[in-house]
Amino acid sequence: SIDLPIDRDNDSLLKRRIDPNGAPAHTDYQVLAHKNGLSLLRLVPQTGRTHQLRLHMASIGHPLAGDWLYGTEDKSLIPRPALHSYSVHLRHPVTGEILNVIAPLPEDMRRLLQ
């Protein structure tokens, strides 16, 4: 897991930074697969900070493929940050039923692991 506090980056309107005085941020992760020098991870944010997953991965030396803000501007692998919400659990606002919404991995991300 990654337990690093996050705060706004004073030099940017968009970026966040790891800062000991920032808001607590905790991310659990599990490596699911490796291929072509890339890894498929399950990331589970335990807090909900802006850019938390992107910043936490970059801060441990593993930025997301295609992440121009916290990684590299190289868009040859994928033209966007390789981040996808596969499964979301939420409570229905009327019935209170717990819903699990699943979205398969998009084609551009599947190609990265072929």
Predicted regions and their residues:
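RNA pseudouridine synthases
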Residues: S1-Q114
